[in-house]
Amino acid sequence: ISFIGSTRTGKKIFENCSKTIKRMTLELGGKSPTILLEDANFKDAIPHIFSSAYSNSGQACHAGSRLLVPKHTVEEVEQLLLDYIHTLNIGDPKSETTQLGPMINQKQFDTVQSYIKSGIDEGAKLLCGGLGKAEGFEKGYFVKPTIFICHNQNLKIVQEEIFGPVLCVL
């Protein structure tokens, strides 16, 4: 049995599997990183970083919601991210041209908003996005695609899975 998800659910699976000595692999409570090495072509990497972080509006366990970059490249990466994020097509997730759709429901929208507020309150640098609905999408649960620059790995937004379109750059 393989499971990726919350620690609470993983404990239940572990308890049930241990009763019958089943083999299992559990990845619990992690937050998937994308690592951008300094010998990479940054401009070519940016679309893949966005695809990893914002695919399914970030509502996936495998979303690459942490971007680890060499410290001396942060400013260059910031600019490339800003240039690219403004090209994202937000809209109907059934459309082939849409790159970012809404959250699944109001509860998830509110959860993502609370994480964004936490990032702001804890001092992460808000590069773009932030609280509220994406411009032009007052109906539905469209979160602004958000990027934080984080100089502290202990922030809640760095440590916990958000399941929304929020990218943390470290």
For the regions a language model picked out, list residue spans one by one:
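Active-site donor-binding acidic/aromatic loop of nucleotide-activated sugar
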Residues: C168-L170
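Short, surface-exposed loop/turn microsegments at beta-strand edges and helix-strand junctions
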Residues: E161-I162
